Every structure is written in C-alpha cells, then in structure tokens.
C-alpha cells in the first residue's frame, strides 16, 4: 500500500535537552530518516510506537498507531491509526530509503493502561500483543521492548544508532492526562462505536515523579532484550 503523504510527520524543532534537531510524531503519523542525525519523539498511552532501523546504514523510523487492526473490508482500515497499516507503511518506507529487510531491528514501546476508557477495552494490551506478533511474522527481531503497565511514556529515538530514551510518567500524573486524554480520545470513540462499550475517563491526581530508562542496541552476539 502506498503511504499517505499527509501521514508523514512534519513537526520539526530543536530539542535543547538532547542538543539535537528533532521531529515530533503524533498519533497516526510516521517518520523515516535518510541517514540524517535527528531525534524522533512521541508520547504514548495505550498507543504503540515501533522504532525500526537498519544498523548498517543508520536509517530508521518510527510510527505511532492507536488500534491493532480494522475491518479489512473497510477503507478506514487503510489508515495510519491501525497497526496493520502503520507497520506496513513504516517497513516499506525504510526499504525505499535503502534499508535491507534482513538487517532490520525493532524496539517497541507503549500499550499502557493509562486511561480507564482504554483499560475497559484492553486497547493497550491488544496493541502490544499485535506489534510483537506482527514483527515475529515478518521475521524482524525485537531488540528491546517496554510494553503495558500503567505509565504514559515519552519516547526519544535516535535512528542513526538505535538508541531509545524512555521517560515514564508516574501513574495518575496530571500532565499525562492532558497529553494522553487529548491525543487518544479519537481511539476511544472509534472503539466505542465498534463495541458499544461505555468508556470512562478518570482524572489523575498530583504528579508523583518520573523514571527514565535507556534502551541501547545490543551487539549481535548479545541476547535479545533491553
């Protein structure tokens, strides 16, 4: 399937904390580098981001999808909000940029049960299981993963060398509510319409702190993991 041009992230900025040019990836977007030294950043709740790169040529990309799969008979399923389409687009764009399929490596993040609406429908868990199954089917090794739990996550990905920095917001973090509830409302509404479930969105209490984790790429002789 050809990638929709309007799904490619275009929000560029300079991140002073990392002293790096950066691209912000919003839900339903993706970005693939062409060897440039740039950081890709996104915020995840129940959504999942796959970070895939070719370590030999330093080309990589990230997507951000909301739901696992849609009705294959519906035109709406061919949109970036569905993992099946978002993964296909990301991999195809990496290959167009010169990556070799047999060298692709992945790191996957998100799928948290952050909002009550998403907990009710197991969206985060379904997204996480989907991306792992998809990559296994495609034969792409998962070098690191941080899926599930109850945390919102900020992902900072450096495609050139495969590094990923994950900042986890504490459960019931007010800032997480503002970011995640706004960006994932569309996903909850979509699933509600499909399942007739009645989602609840609870408010978060005072922030309690954050935890930052780093996911480097192990050497090919190291065991798979974080």
Swiss-Prot record:
Region (Disordered), start-end ranges: 207-226
Catalysis performed (reactions): L-glutaminyl-[protein] + H2O = L-glutamyl-[protein] + NH4(+)
Recorded superkingdom: Bacteria
One GO MF term: protein-glutamine glutaminase activity
EC class: hydrolase
A GO biological process held by the record: chemotaxis
Enzyme Commission number(s) from the entry: 3.5.1.44
Task performed by this protein: Probably deamidates glutamine residues to glutamate on methyl-accepting chemotaxis receptors (MCPs), playing an important role in chemotaxis.
Family statement drawn from the similarity comment of this UniProt entry: Belongs to the CheD family.
Name of the featured protein: Probable chemoreceptor glutamine deamidase CheD
């Amino acid at each position: 399937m050809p990638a929709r041009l309007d799904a490619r992230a275009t929000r560029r900025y300079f991140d002073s904390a990392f002293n790096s040019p950066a691209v912000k990836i919003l839900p339903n977007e993706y970005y693939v580098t062409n060897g440039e030294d740039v950081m890709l950043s996104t915020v995840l709740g129940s959504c999942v981001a796959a970070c895939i790169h070719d370590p030999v040529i330093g080309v990589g990309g990230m997507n951000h999808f909301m739901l696992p799969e849609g009705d294959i008979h519906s035109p709406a399923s061919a949109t970036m909000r569905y993992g099946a389409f978002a993964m296909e687009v990301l991999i195809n764009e990496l290959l167009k940029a010169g990556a070799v399929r047999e060298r692709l490596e992945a790191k996957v993040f998100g799928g948290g049960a952050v909002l009550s609406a998403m907990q009710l429908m197991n969206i985060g868990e379904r997204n996480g299981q989907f991306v792992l199954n998809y990559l296994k089917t495609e034969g792409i090794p998962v070098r690191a993963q941080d899926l599930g739990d109850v945390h919102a996550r900020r992902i900072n990905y450096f495609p050139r060398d495969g590094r990923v920095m994950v900042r986890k917001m504490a459960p019931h973090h007010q800032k997480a509510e503002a970011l995640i509830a706004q960006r994932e409302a569309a996903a909850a509404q979509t699933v509600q319409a499909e399942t007739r479930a009645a989602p609840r969105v609870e408010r978060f209490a005072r922030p309690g702190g954050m935890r930052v984790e780093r996911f480097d790429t192990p050497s090919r002789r190291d065991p798979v993991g974080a």
